[in-house]
């Protein structure tokens, strides 16, 4: 990451969130991604569609299909609930100050 002189990284969701968070911190790179678990395991922040809400909505489509509904007749839906999680412990380790207004907008702030 540092080889390319990046100032920060946005990481595509990954099963290796903990490793990615640790590497970013080691390289002193602020990093953000979608799943909230990234911030929970040490990433700077995560922002994206609320996973459980999206899964519940998908399950509703499965029920309709199993009851005989035609997928082609079902509307395409976009996420409506998003979640911002900020890890202040990581921010401090990186020497970053997260503005108070951003902390106040967050769904969760990890101290």
Residue map of PLM features:
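Short hydrophobic alpha-helices and adjacent helix-cap/hinge residues
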Residues: 1-111
């Amino acid at each position: 990451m540092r080889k390319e002189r990046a100032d920060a990284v946005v990481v595509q969701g990954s099963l290796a969130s903990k490793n990615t968070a640790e590497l970013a911190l080691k390289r002193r790179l602020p990093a953000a991604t979608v799943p909230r678990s990234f911030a929970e395991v040490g990433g700077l922040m995560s922002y994206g569609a609320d996973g459980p809400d999206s899964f519940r909505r998908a399950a509703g489509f499965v029920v309709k299909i199993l009851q005989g509904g035609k997928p082609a007749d079902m509307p395409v839906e976009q996420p409506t609930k998003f979640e911002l999680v900020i890890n202040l412990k990581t921010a401090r380790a990186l020497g970053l100050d997260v503005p108070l207004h951003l902390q106040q907008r967050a769904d969760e702030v990890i101290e």
